[in-house]
Amino acid sequence: SVTEHFNVYKATRPYXXXCADCGDGYFCYSPVAIEKIRDEASDGMLKIQVSAQIGLDKAGTHAHTKLRYMAGHDVQESKRDSLRVYTSAACSIHGTMGHFIVAHCPPGDYLKVSFEDADSHVKACKVQYKHNPLPVGREKFVVRPHFGVELPCTSYQLTTAPTDEEIDMHTPPDIPDRTLLSQTAGNVKITAGGRTIRYNCTWGRDNVGTTSTDKTINACKIDQCHAAVTSHDKWQFTSPFVPRADQTARKGKVHVPFPLTNVTCRVPLARAPDVTYGKKEVTLRLHPDHPTLFSYRSLGAEPHPYEEWVDKFSERIIPVTEEGXEYQWGNNPPVRLWAXLTTEGKPHGWPHEIIQYYYGLYPAATIAAVSGXSLMALLTLAATCCMLATARRKCLTPYALTPGAVVPLTLGLXXCAPRANA
């Protein structure tokens, strides 16, 4: 049961640890110090480890509505409902157990955890943390849709059952407390108040030791004494933000709840684009409801991939070759296209129809062939004209040199001979 899962905390206690910003921009020893923030989940969920213990009352008994924290040298409890997690805005807390919180948070540049103590004072810790989760899939949506498509993703499983991952617990350090010392007529009085006090004075007699009752160090001053509360009946997390105890060996362990697991996430499906097919190209009209990824690539030896985030109505023209092209719009499945060898004209029709047919299939070769044939025709025409002029001249020259000669009618017609003048 869940209560049994919390039994591992019976031998532990919360603690106060160093926090650089306790919510007001100043350093303090916070009862809700942030130890670690984990963001391995692809669905954007965070797992946060803090110094307070959630789901336990002051005595260490499982109580879902409580959290316990260290106030000075004593453990106190408060309401779990006062627990808050923030980035740029409030986070949604999905689960808590002991030192751990799992929550979904909006993007932000910091993370803050706070609660109200037994006296209704806000206790907090704030750390610099860049939270900008990548979207699941290819669409940057804000609200998970009712309908869409399920994609594989990872998330923190909301279970408090034991796992293979653990955190180390060790003996708490002695906590210095100058308020335990008071000056009385040249003597230093140590007020135990029911606690075990370790003291060390550099002056006077019987000046080093431990005591659980009030004690006076004669002929001494407060500045010459050091007093600390020592309590080793419980363990606490081995934190880098807490002074280490004299006994540094691991004393116990607590399992880390909410393991990372493979799940599916529902994501939106972008509206299908309007498609217009052209000659070796396709025109897409895109209507995104939110920033949506558009990408395409060639299916040939060189894919030349291209992608962009589209956040407003856009029109894109992509080339389609015989080797094929593939485009994908948002979370829709990819679409593959190939250019078909279609053309106009007729392969066995009139010359202009033949040229039109082959131009559609092989434009460069057709232009070269037509240009070559046209050039040959022009050269042939020029040569023919030259030969005809030469033949005419040779045919008419004898008659031109003979006085009174008459050009025969047939030759005159073939050589376009001028009429004779009287």
Curated annotation (Swiss-Prot):
Protein's GO biological process: symbiont entry into host cell; virion attachment to host cell
Record region (Transient transmembrane before p62-6K protein processing): 395-415
Positions bearing carbohydrate: N200, N262
Pfam families referenced in this protein's UniProt entry, alphabetically: Alpha_E2_glycop
Lipidation (S-palmitoyl cysteine): C385, C395, C416
Cytoplasmic-side segments: 383-422
Gene3D superfamilies reported in the protein's UniProt record: Alphavirus E2 glycoprotein, A domain, Alphavirus E2 glycoprotein, domain B, Alphavirus E2 glycoprotein, domain C
Chain ranges passing through the membrane: 360-382
Superkingdom field: Viruses
GO CC terms: host cell plasma membrane; membrane; T=4 icosahedral viral capsid; virion membrane
Function: Spike glycoprotein E2: Plays a role in viral attachment to target host cell, by binding to the cell receptor. Synthesized as a p62 precursor which is processed by furin at the cell membrane just before virion budding, giving rise to E2-E1 heterodimer. The p62-E1 heterodimer is stable, whereas E2-E1 is unstable and dissociate at low pH. p62 is processed at the last step, presumably to avoid E1 fusion activation before its final export to cell surface.
Subunit structure: Spike glycoprotein E2: Processing of the precursor of protein E3/E2 into E2 and E3 results in a heterodimer of the spike glycoproteins E2 and E1. Spike glycoprotein E2: Spike at virion surface are constituted of three E2-E1 heterodimers. Spike glycoprotein E2: Interacts with 6K protein.
Note: Structural polyprotein: Translated from a subgenomic RNA synthesized during togavirus replication.
Protein name, UniProt field: Structural polyprotein
